[in-house]
Amino acid sequence: MPRAERERQMMDAGVRVFGERGYRAASMDEIAELAGVSKPLVYLYLNSKEDLFTACIRREAAALIAAVRAGVRVDVPADRQLWDGLTAFFAHTAEHPDGWAVLHSQARSGGDPFVAEVVAMREEIVAFVTSLIAAAAREAHGDPELAEREVAGLAQALVGAAEALAGWANGDDSVSAREAAATMMNFAWAGLGNLMAGARWSVPDAS
């Protein structure tokens, strides 16, 4: 079997075990058995448990980002782009629950080196969402200009909400990717639409 195919099998097994048990509780013996190889071969190919976990994080992050980008068309309005991106995001996390568990929860509890990998992925997604919100502001009627700081904050809030919603949706088999995406659009875009049109919530006096 080619080395690349063997490594893919090992990483598939790693994602499943890490996703279910977490980094610290995961056993290289279990990963090797699930992959159908010897434990020494796992170490020969992927060096260490830490390196295997890092490789799993990077692979799953790249796959998620690729899925979201592939799902978005650039020739449609910004709200449709966001809808397409959210649908692709929730479809991917539903189809790869262990991969999402690795990215969203297990990597964050594994320590600084792993957290840094997830932060890099999240920053790329936030940058993508930031560009969509900025585009929506440019497309809007009235006074569409939003401060750069405000756009960045809105993107952070939207991504954080989508991450939380993915965890909820994956815990309920009755929730489809489209339903999760629609929930997110109703929560986020309805408010963003008003904001783009110049309707803002009035901050109360500090008294």
Label the predicted regions.
Residues 51, 84, 91-128, 141-152, ...:
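Short secondary-structure transition hinges
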Residues 52-71:
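Histidine- and aromatic-rich ligand-binding microenvironments
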Residues 62-65, 112-139, 149-156, 179-190:
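Amphipathic alpha-helical packing segments from all-alpha helical-bundle domains
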Residues 91-95, 99, 131, 135, ...:
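Amphipathic C-terminal alpha-helical segment
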Residues 55, 70-98, 148, 158, ...:
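Hydrophobic alpha-helical connector segments
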Residues 9, 13, 17-51, 55:
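Helix-turn-helix
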